[in-house]
């Protein structure tokens, strides 16, 4: 009788447990900070594609819907940001400053604060300075495998061994190592041990922003170019976040500057991105605070790399023309019946490489500019770097031959099809290549890097 009762209790316990598990919300995962989706360019790729948390190699081939079964890929260009990295030296110095305040000045009694003061140690060192971490290595290895599964006729062992896949990278260590990691993802996938594959360092393409004199002088090194950013930092939304942090720590308001507020946000973001830890630092922010921090970062990217100034996007003219030169070459070879000599181009750079190009192409442009005073009206904005530019962000352009000279171009951002702005077709996100070229005709005929980047005697106002 006791045995029967015991089995009855266990059976009902299992049923209840299963029911509870079925109702678990993935967003309630305590290992993921509640504010993780607001980390801007410091965010994980998995926050943009949450299904990867269950299976990092998962792909969904059904997202590619060519207008006919005849369509075959003939060329693929991927422009990819480097993987997860350490903070820069500047950020690390600010983190150390904040940590010292928390250790010596904070008098709050919350458990998370005691954890920082007694268990957490400042493990970031200045020599780390933006270098790739192991997670960043894995970001590119896994991306290589997923893209090879999504486009098996392009990113194939045959094309790799045949020299039809080309690798180009920025000279920065984190980009070179990301490129090596992408290649390793493929060679390990196909167990290639008898051959190595070269890459080319090309800062002219992948760090064009450093070489555009007008951009450097008028925007990058010009405080007046980011006046909206600085005004927002001094505004009521940001002041509220700083005061709430000071209250949580129980320190004077004067100790928590904007830079230290940003350092606290980065501590949460880096701990999660690098170590997959929901750090006690994350408790300094609620969702309202995180949205303000996200907007402050978006505002900076908007005015320094995005739509804020015309030269921001025009600095990417070289890369823009290079992409279309490759597409035209592939189209020409295909039309004449030749094998496409550069089937795949993998180009690894920075968020600062991708954002000006996305801007030049017209992606994520809102009807109103982002300013210091319209935070409340921009809650539904398209321009959100948390969605656009996580670590390992990628813009992939795939050229298809659909038969009878019908060439089509499919853009994907972070492995999701997107539509070229101004080329909306409800039937497909894969427009005719000729229509794409016509849409960007003015840029293809103009957009001269040397002319755009020349520093005039009387620079344009910013």
Residue ranges and their predicted role:
Residues 23-166, 170-462:
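Signature for phosphate-centric chemistry
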Residues 5-22:
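Cleavable N-terminal signal peptides of Sec/SRP-targeted secreted and luminal proteins
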């Amino acid at each position: 009788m006791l045995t029967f009762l015991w089995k009855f209790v266990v059976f009902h316990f299992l049923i209840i447990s299963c029911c509870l598990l079925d109702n678990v919300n993935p967003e309630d995962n305590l290992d993921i900070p509640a504010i993780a989706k607001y980390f801007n360019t410091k965010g994980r790729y998995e926050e943009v594609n949450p299904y990867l948390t269950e299976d990092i190699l998962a792909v969904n081939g059904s997202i590619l819907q060519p207008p006919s079964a005849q369509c075959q890929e003939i060329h693929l260009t991927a422009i990819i940001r480097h993987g997860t990295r350490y903070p820069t030296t500047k950020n690390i110095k600010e983190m150390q400053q904040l940590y010292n305040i928390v250790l010596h000045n904070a008098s709050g009694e919350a458990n998370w604060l005691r954890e920082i003061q007694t268990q957490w140690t400042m493990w970031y060192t200045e020599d780390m300075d933006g270098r790739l971490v192991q997670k960043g290595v894995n970001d590119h290895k896994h991306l290589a495998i997923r893209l090879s599964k999504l486009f098996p006729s392009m990113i194939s062992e045959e094309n790799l061994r045949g020299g039809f896949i080309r690798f180009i990278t920025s000279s920065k260590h984190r980009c070179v190592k990301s490129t090596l990691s992408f290649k390793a993802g493929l060679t390990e996938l196909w167990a290639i041990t008898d051959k190595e594959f070269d890459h080319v360092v090309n800062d002219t393409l992948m760090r064009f922003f450093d070489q555009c004199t007008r951009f450097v002088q008028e925007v990058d090194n010009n405080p007046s170019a980011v006046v909206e950013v600085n005004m927002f930092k001094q505004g009521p939304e940001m002041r509220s976040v700083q005061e709430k942090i000071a209250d949580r720590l129980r320190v004077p308001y004067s100790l928590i500057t904007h830079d230290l507020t940003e350092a606290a946000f980065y501590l949460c973001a880096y701990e999660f991105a690098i170590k997959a830890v929901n750090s006690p630092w994350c408790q300094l922010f609620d969702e309202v605070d995180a949205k303000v921090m996200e907007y402050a970062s978006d505002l900076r990217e908007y005015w320094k790399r995005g739509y804020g100034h015309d030269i921001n996007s025009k600095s990417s003219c070289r890369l823009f023309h290079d992409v279309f030169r490759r597409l035209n070459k592939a189209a020409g070879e295909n039309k004449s019946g030749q094998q496409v000599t550069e089937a795949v181009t993998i180009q690894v750079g920075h968020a600062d490489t991708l954002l000006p190009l996305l801007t030049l192409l017209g992606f994520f442009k809102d009807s109103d500019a982002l300013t210091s005073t319209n935070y409340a009206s921009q809650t539904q904005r398209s321009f959100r770097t948390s969605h656009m530019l996580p670590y390992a962000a990628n813009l992939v352009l795939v050229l298809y031959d659909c038969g009878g000279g019908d060439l089509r171009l499919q853009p994907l951002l972070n492995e999701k099809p997107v539509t070229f702005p101004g080329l909306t077709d409800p039937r497909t996100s894969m427009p005719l290549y000729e229509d794409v070229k016509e849409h960007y005709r003015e840029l293809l005929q103009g957009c001269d890097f040397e002319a755009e980047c020349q520093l005039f005697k009387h620079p344009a106002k910013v």
